[in-house]
Amino acid sequence: MWIGIISLFPEMFRAITDYGVTGRAVKNGLLSIQSWSPRDFTHDRHRTVDDRPYGGGPGMLMMVQPLRDAIHAAKAAAGEGAKVIYLSPQGRKLDQAGVSELATNQKLILVCGRYEGIDERVIQTEIDEEWSIGDYVLSGGELPAMTLIDSVSRFIPGVLGHEASATEDSFAEGLLDCPHYTRPEVLEGMEVPPVLLSGNHAEIRRWRLKQSLGRTWLRRPELLENLALTEEQARLLAEFKTEHAQQQHKHDGMA
């Protein structure tokens, strides 16, 4: 996968290119990242990249000409088929379904805004899609872009050590992940659930699915509203609710 970055601070993306899973993907040639700074397309000695908004108000906007020229340079490098994305609070909220959808693209160009944003006409003429990582304000689009790159790159074949990892992640099936345990078997009196030590793969799968359903019900119940549960999932969720109620009753009795 090829990803182009439009940013005033391209150095920030070393967090993606030099470290962790994405760093290995870049090193192994599975992910290619190039960046363009609008500052490199300015024509004044101050390398100005901001301008006042019409109508007044606080803050500045990114200057149109350097930004457009940077986008055009990225498009030229990408060739045909690159989707241009602007990271914006007004965009579609990124979720696992959206990540999976974006991962089907071989080429992406991510435009990172700064200041109060970018000219609406640039959005209309240069941007294919707007995406947001949440309903809150950040200083720029770099962190959302890195979030998008990290999540999308997990779907690139060969990036993860285990090919099933991406499909078993939290939200991969619309559910939160189940609890995980490693050594020691007993930690300050807290034991690993016996089923995970049993070697019975069918029971382990069943336990993990039940815990995943239960954790989603407890922490993000709205996610279940959009799911059509199978008979097995509905049965396991009912079991979890019963067990949870019993544990709560026992806990209340001891309090």
Curated annotation (Swiss-Prot):
Question: In the UniProt entry, which residues are flagged as the active site?
Answer: D169 (proton acceptor)
Specify the inducers. Answer: Part of the rpsP-rimM-trmD-rplS operon.
Task: State what changing R114A does.
Answer: Loss of activity
* Pfam annotation, one family: tRNA_m1G_MT
EC number assigned by the record: 2.1.1.228
Molecular-function GO terms, alphabetical: identical protein binding; magnesium ion binding; protein homodimerization activity; tRNA (guanine(37)-N1)-methyltransferase activity
Q: What is the effect of changing Y136A?
A: Increases Km for S-adenosyl-L-methionine 68-fold
Catalytic activity reported: guanosine(37) in tRNA + S-adenosyl-L-methionine = N(1)-methylguanosine(37) in tRNA + S-adenosyl-L-homocysteine + H(+)
Please provide the record's keywords in A-Z order.
Cytoplasm, Methyltransferase, S-adenosyl-L-methionine, Transferase, tRNA processing
Effect seen on changing G141A:
Increases Km for S-adenosyl-L-methionine 82-fold
**Other notes:** The specific activity of this enzyme increases only slightly with increased growth rate.
Q: What does this protein do?
A: Specifically methylates guanosine-37 in various tRNAs.
Q: State the PANTHER family in the record.
A: TRNA (GUANINE-N(1)-)-METHYLTRANSFERASE
Q: What is this protein called?
A: tRNA (guanine-N(1)-)-methyltransferase
This protein's species is: Escherichia coli (strain K12)
What are the leading ranks of the lineage?
A: Bacteria, Pseudomonadati, Pseudomonadota, Gammaproteobacteria, Enterobacterales
